[in-house]
């Protein structure tokens, strides 16, 4: 795994900075493409269902679940 890469996404009208390993960004990009949504829309979907879990952790878990892990 590489070092963290930050991206800024707009969630519910607010710019949010999210730091993930490049491998997780690549996985989320693939998922967004498969679902025909933007990366921001995908992360918004993850954000809504994450509960108390930090957003970065929720994104990693989501990517692993979608990968079958």
Per-region residue spans from a language model:
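Aromatic side chains
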Residues: 14, 24-25, 62
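Short, well-ordered coil↔helix boundary/capping segments
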Residues: 18-22, 33, 53
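Surface-exposed, Lys/Arg-rich phosphate-binding patches that contact polyanionic backbones
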Residues: 23-41, 45-48
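C-terminal structural segments of small proteins and small subunits
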Residues: 48-69
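Alpha-helix N-cap/helix-initiation sites
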Residues: 17, 39, 52-56
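Glycine-rich, flexible loop/turn motifs
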Residues: 5-7, 42, 51
């Amino acid at each position: 795994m590489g070092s963290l890469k930050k991206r800024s996404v707009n969630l519910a009208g607010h710019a949010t900075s999210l730091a993930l390993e490049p491998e997780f960004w690549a996985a989320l990009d693939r998922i967004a493409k498969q679902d025909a949504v933007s990366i921001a829309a995908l992360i918004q979907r993850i954000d809504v269902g994450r509960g108390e879990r930090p957003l970065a952790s929720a994104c990693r878990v989501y990517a692993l679940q979608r990968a079958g892990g």
